Amino acid sequence: MNILIALIPALGWGIFSLIAGKIKNSHPANELMGLGTGALIIGIITAIIHPASSNITIFSLSLISGMFCALGQSGQFISMRNIGISKTMPLSTGFQLIGNTLIGAIIFGEWTSSSQYLIGTLALILIIVGVSLTAISKDKSAKLKMRDIILLLFTSIGYWIYSSFPKAITANAQTLFLPQMIGIFIGSIIFLLVSRQTKVLKEKATWLNIFSGFSYGIAAFSYIFSAQLNGVITAFIYSQLCVIISTLGGIFFIGENKTKSELIATFVGLILIIIGAAIQ
């Protein structure tokens, strides 16, 4: 049952990027605002069905972690439009894996034996090699630029904080979830204000992206449970199987072009990701 719960975030986080990518005339500001709104709605519904008590400290910290999540998501949406879903997601996954694995192993002490370090390191190597293979491109115009890498690396800090937060405090999932979704919504508003794109609130694409927010919100709720049941490292690695859904979806559903050799590299990379997640 714990593993099934760990796989729900992979499904939700894999699908939401495809929903956003399929909406016409959609831009990062539309996508982030729509996601924030949809996630907030899921948070409110969850709070009504499963009300949970909290205190000002836990509520405030949860809200801040949600705002950091919005930072991470803004980088993903911008990169998706610049270099495509099938390149963004593997690279983003790699950065997140490195950060969250180090946080889980060093700060939370989830690796306590030499065998755990050995197996965990092997799993991490397989997954990083896998995501690197999925990002291979022979088209010079489509190759990653340093600015794309720096953007994703910087914004991934938001994901590191958000992903590790459920393990940092003692509270149940229901207590954490609503304030985190409020934080994502507030973070989305801040993004619009800072980038001076408040006009997107009137655009159809923003409201259609609420459906991607529904998918994201369900995944986020499941992730909180998974992190508490399975530990940060295991929960995160399983959740990042979303890269399989988003990468293949970007190619076959969105229609992002890849040559035969690039497809082979992508499939090999995805297999390595699955193996790495399975042995973790």
UniProtKB/Swiss-Prot annotation:
Any one of the GO CC terms: plasma membrane
Spell out the subcellular localization from the entry: Cell membrane
| Family from the record | Belongs to the GRP transporter (TC 2.A.7.5) family.
Bilayer disposition of the protein: Multi-pass membrane protein
Q: What is this protein called?
A: Putative sugar uptake protein
- GO MF annotation terms: carbohydrate transmembrane transporter activity
Please tell me whether the keyword RNA-binding is annotated for this protein. Answer: no
The protein's matches in InterPro entries, at most eight in alphabetical order, are given as:
Sugar_transport (IPR010651)
Listed A to Z, the keywords are: Cell membrane, Membrane, Sugar transport, Transmembrane, Transmembrane helix, Transport
The organism's taxonomic lineage, starting at the top: Bacteria, Bacillati, Bacillota, Bacilli, Lactobacillales
Q: List where the protein spans the membrane.
A: 4-21, 33-52, 56-78, 91-113, 117-136, 149-166, 176-195, 207-229, 233-255, 262-279
Report the source organism. Answer: Lactobacillus helveticus
